[in-house]
């Protein structure tokens, strides 16, 4: 087995940041979902020391998955239930997304994917960094 020259730490869901124009209808209920589904402290847990940063590169997304989910595929099957790159439905919550908001979110998604791709080559190990809530009843762990 060959040794990797670099390690990239993908930290996609550590933020709870949600712009005020996000389109969600019930912010109080959404806040509960954000608290449950944010991968709390992964941006800190997977943050290498300065000495290691030449070989271990953290890449974190600055917004909540409820604004843009950078771990979805461009044509993700979950889009059919409102949980693609731009969530429109989650449990009982609904989000109105106009063309302007969708385009903005897709640009954020593409920017993150491009940034992540810049760090990756055939000698790179990509590690997907997550945490899970103590109640795992709703969590799908592969």
Task: State where each predicted segment sits.
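N-terminal catalytic or cofactor-binding beta/alpha core of small enzyme domains
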Residues: 1-126, 131-142
